[in-house]
């Protein structure tokens, strides 16, 4: 399903001295600057990874702030992955950044183009293999991940949103099949599985601001992957996550839902589960 030539990057990939020096200038505190934005990186000690997780922060966060979650950071680095965290645009009169994720609402930046430029920079300057990049995000970062996967599914080989999905009105369809693992807290009250009304008196009001329904999102993903049945094909409750997977779908696609007994958090053990899933695709 996922093929990527990225021939325009071949010259940059050959420029070893430039690539190494440019990459070394980027850290968890010093941003890498790309078109329309910036991102921060952490790399495993003493290693030159060829795999990466790009992690999109939630509402009011920042790329640098992602690394304050040491559990997430260490879990990714310990697996030998580079961790990259782009920054959303700062909000007027508010602290932190956010994302123009919903295609039907005002766009402060072409977020798909920006995140794609982060991908390209990682490939060119950090020698990351384009077939070994997992895009993930939490809360609104999970929503941004989902909308990118829906609109431009071939941008990344796989997607793993956490605690955030589509908003209302839901997409009517996606541009192609995906490999996607959605993780969500069973008792999430900030972004409930069924969604939440943030503005307006009814989710159907004109101008209402309402989160979407995760189960409806899974229906959209099943349609994108041309899955044979509504019902999942595999169930696994043996570990900390309650997992269900749809296997009888388009060749090369993958779809899984993982729930856990908790709220609006990145759950302990998520990185191991997600990277195990990614590496076994």
Regions found by a protein language model. Name each.
Residues 179-183, 211-212, 222-281:
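C-terminal catalytic histidine-bearing segment of alpha/beta-hydrolase fold enzymes
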Residues 10-19:
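Bacterial N-terminal signal peptides
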Residues 21-52, 65, 78, 107, ...:
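A domain-start/cap signature at the N-terminus of enzymes
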Residues 186-233:
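Accessory cap/linker subdomain of secreted extracellular hydrolases
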Residues 88, 160-167, 185-189:
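Active-site nucleophile loop of the alpha/beta-hydrolase fold
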Residues 29-134, 151, 194, 271, ...:
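Serine-hydrolase catalytic machinery in alpha/beta-hydrolase-like enzymes
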Residues 1-11:
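Bacterial N-terminal signal peptides that target proteins for export
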